[in-house]
């Protein structure tokens, strides 16, 4: 199987300054990953029914609302969350979602520290500064998360850390964080983790 066949737009020709046309190379996956063909097909098939969600009684609005709610349930099931105890809130992109979470998270005066790694994009750093006290976790000289520093800061601020905000992978180096291990440590310290 050729994995390139699974995506839309990988063979798009773009102009260079000298007038030549070349195949586009996408180096911006952190912001806008190419769509999967299957997803594009599903969107195309649904467009005839597309309407406002939770805002109308017409047939198309009811179909759109049902599809939206089914997507929420599917997302909760995918992450193993019980819909009786959790809710899925969609955002346009990671920046909007992180801003929403930062403004709605129940920080308290006693528990308002957010651990943020130094590898984070501003969209996962700046929103937290507006709502609590950000403590940055350092990186190793080769750009990896300094897990020893992470552990020290968890211990130093024990009981006061509300949130750990960390990327699954660096959009600069490609380093993949040990998320499961970090989540276990965060939860053991009484903090939530946002990946």
Residue ranges and their predicted role:
Residues 1-195:
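Pyridoxal 5′-phosphate
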């Amino acid at each position: 199987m050729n994995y390139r066949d699974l995506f839309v737009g990988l063979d798009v020709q773009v102009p260079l300054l000298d007038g030549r046309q070349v195949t586009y190379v996408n180096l911006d996956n952190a912001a806008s990953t190419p769509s999967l063909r299957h997803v594009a097909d599903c969107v195309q098939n649904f467009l005839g029914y597309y309407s406002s969600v939770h805002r109308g009684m017409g047939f198309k609005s009811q179909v759109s609302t049902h599809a939206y709610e089914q997507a929420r349930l599917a997302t909760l099931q995918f992450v193993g969350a019980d819909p009786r105890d959790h809710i899925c809130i969609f955002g346009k992109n990671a920046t909007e979602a992180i801003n929403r979470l930062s403004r709605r998270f129940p920080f308290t005066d006693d528990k308002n520290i957010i651990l943020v790694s130094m590898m984070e994009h501003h969209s996962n750093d700046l929103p937290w500064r507006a709502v609590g006290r950000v403590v940055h976790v350092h990186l190793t000289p080769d750009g990896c998360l300094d897990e020893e520093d992470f552990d020290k800061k968890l211990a130093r601020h024990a009981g006061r850390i509300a949130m750990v905000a960390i990327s699954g992978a660096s959009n600069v180096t490609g380093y993949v964080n040990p998320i499961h291990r970090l989540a276990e440590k965060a939860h053991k310290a009484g903090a939530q983790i946002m990946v």
